[in-house]
Each structure stands twice: as C-alpha cells, then as structure tokens.
Amino acid sequence: MKYNYTVLLSAFTMSVLYSVIYIHSFIIAALITMAFYFLFPYLIFALPLQIMMNKKPKRFSPLYLLYYLAAAFIANAIIFGMLQPSGQSLFQNTAFYLFAVLTALIYWIWDSVLLQKKEA
C-alpha cells in the first residue's frame, strides 16, 4: 500500500511543481490533469524499480537516486521524443533535463521517506 502512496504523492508533487514553473498559479483542473500525466510514467518506470530496490532498503541512498535518474532520463526521452516537434533536438531542450532530474528527485525523496529503512 505504501507503494501507492509514493506514486500518488510523487505525481501530485510534480503537478504542483509543474504548475508553479509553467502555469504560475494553482488551477485545480491543471493540478489534477498534470497529476495523471505524471502518474502513468511513475507506474511504468519507477514503481518496478522501487519494488526491486526495496529488497535491500536504504534510506536516501545516492545509488538509488542514480537508478531513478537513469529511469527518469529514459522515460522523459520517450515522452519528450513523442511530444516535441521533429525538428527540435531533444538534448537542447532544457525542460527535458529539468523534468528528468525533478521526477527522479521527487520520487527518490518520497520513496526514502515512506518506504526505505535506515541502513544498518
């Protein structure tokens, strides 16, 4: 059940950050829409990785952050590759890097707070 909280809280946190960065206000419809937008990539990419890493739980592990960053860059490359115009380079888009780092960092923080145990 805590896996669900991690995914939901991460998606909601990212929707709030998206609203602050791009919309510059809190519009309920935008928060809900963006939460769903962030929810599905988290379910597809981060949740399986989280379940695998929870076999050896470590709170705020830099290695786990690197794993989440790798998954976030792959997920964002797929999503940005589908959504951006064909003439634009993916690696010149600052939003690509911003969202890859933010999605990984937010998920890592919620994962560490809710699920990971202190390292013995």
Swiss-Prot record:
It comes from the Bacteria. The chain crosses the membrane at residues 3-23, 26-46, 63-83, 95-115. It is a multi-pass membrane protein. GO terms for cellular component: plasma membrane. Keywords: Cell membrane, Membrane, Transmembrane, Transmembrane helix. Pfam families: UPF0715. Its main location: membrane. InterPro entries: UPF0715. It is found in: Cell membrane. Belongs to the UPF0715 family. This is UPF0715 membrane protein YwlA.
